[in-house]
Swiss-Prot record:
This is Post-GPI attachment to proteins factor 3. It comes from Drosophila melanogaster (Fruit fly). GO terms for cellular component: endoplasmic reticulum membrane; Golgi membrane. The keyword Signal applies. InterPro entries: Per1-like (IPR007217).
Length: 326
């Protein structure tokens, strides 16, 4: 084996070791021993109750108890930070724990920035939906379709806030499943917009197909071990199909509908915002990570497409309200 090949292998192994250190904090013996000793010393047999001698040490707030921080959870949280500091002392990269970066807990919330931004997204969608209902007649084209997307979004943001508050298997499932429902609904709205002149029967069949697919996918996520990689691929593929569909639509109507530029702008900005999800860095001040920034970026995007709805209404082009529901 040549020295160049050997050097390449050494560099590759070094990169792999670094990657492991950066993502496997919960697999270190240090973390494992710390957690074992903590639970044996401070917790009840089931790991739920804090022993009397440790109550003053943990000093749980009303929010910690409300969000069900058990003694075992407190041990995991404390040992997580002890492990992080141990990595710091050795000059190693900040590790992840169970696939997540370490976050400072605030008022019982595991990821406070993502919770706040999810709630802000919910508030913005709710406020703009109410404004839409005041200004658009119920018999307007795509009135119901816009409501379907809005309600789907509101539900998704509720579960996003709940999941980032406390990460349980159930809250994780509902967050991922309902987040995908928003993306799938975007694709559904695009298809319905393309077929708005076709028969009600055809649109009904397609609606049932979308519903059946989503129920089946929800059931798939609910059974067995959660497949994060597959779920991400499905989300990206669905989003790309919806975006491509709108780009094709914009291309064909560019001479007849000048507002198509707003739709293009929305999807370009959405793509830029989604690129934040590709970044992966330790939380700034242990609170703000790339995922939280993605949630922050979607707040003005919601206002952007509802703003376009208002402009179209003032122009008496009611039929395109549904376009902005994606």
């Amino acid at each position: 084996m040549s020295s160049r090949s050997l050097s390449a292998i050494v560099l590759l192994l070094g990169a792999l070791v670094t990657a492991c250190l950066a993502s496997n904090g919960d697999r270190t013996q240090f973390f494992h021993n710390c957690r074992q000793n903590c639970e044996r010393t401070n917790c009840s047999a089931d790991g739920l109750e804090i022993q009397e001698q440790a109550v003053k040490f943990y000093q749980q707030s009303v929010f910690d108890r409300l969000f069900q921080w058990s003694c075992a959870d407190e041990c995991q949280y404390g040992c997580m930070w002890r492990t992080v500091f141990a990595f710091f002392e050795r000059g190693w990269p900040i590790p992840q724990f169970y696939g997540k970066w370490p976050f400072l807990r605030l008022l019982g919330m595991q990821e406070p920035a993502s919770v706040i931004f999810s709630c802000l997204n919910f508030v913005v969608h709710l406020r703009l939906l109410r404004k839409f209902r005041r200004e658009v007649r119920p018999d307007s084209p795509c009135y119901m379709l816009t409501h379907i997307f809005a309600v789907t979004s509101l539900n998704g943001w509720i579960w996003s806030a709940i999941f980032h508050t406390r990460d349980f298997p159930l809250t994780e499932l509902l967050d991922y499943a309902f987040a995908y429902s928003i993306i799938l609904c975007s694709l559904y709205v695009m298809v319905m917009r393309m077929l708005h002149r076709y028969s009600l029967f055809l649109r009904g069949v397609i609606t049932l197909a979308f519903l059946s697919y989503y129920i089946n996918y929800f059931a798939y996520l609910s059974v067995g071990r959660f497949n994060y990689a597959f779920n991400m691929m499905v989300n990206v593929a669905t989003g790309v199909i919806a975006a491509v569909g709108w780009f094709v639509w914009c291309h064909f109507v560019r001479t007849r509908r000048p507002y198509f530029r707003r739709i293009l702008r929305f999807y370009i900005l959405m793509a830029l915002a989604m690129s934040l999800e590709l970044l992966d860095f330790p939380p700034i001040l242990w609170i703000l990570d790339a995922h939280a920034l993605w949630h922050l970026a979607t707040i003005p995007l919601a206002s952007l497409y509802y703003e376009c709805v208002e402009i179209l209404l003032y122009s008496n082009i009611a039929t395109c309200v549904c376009i902005l529901a994606s």
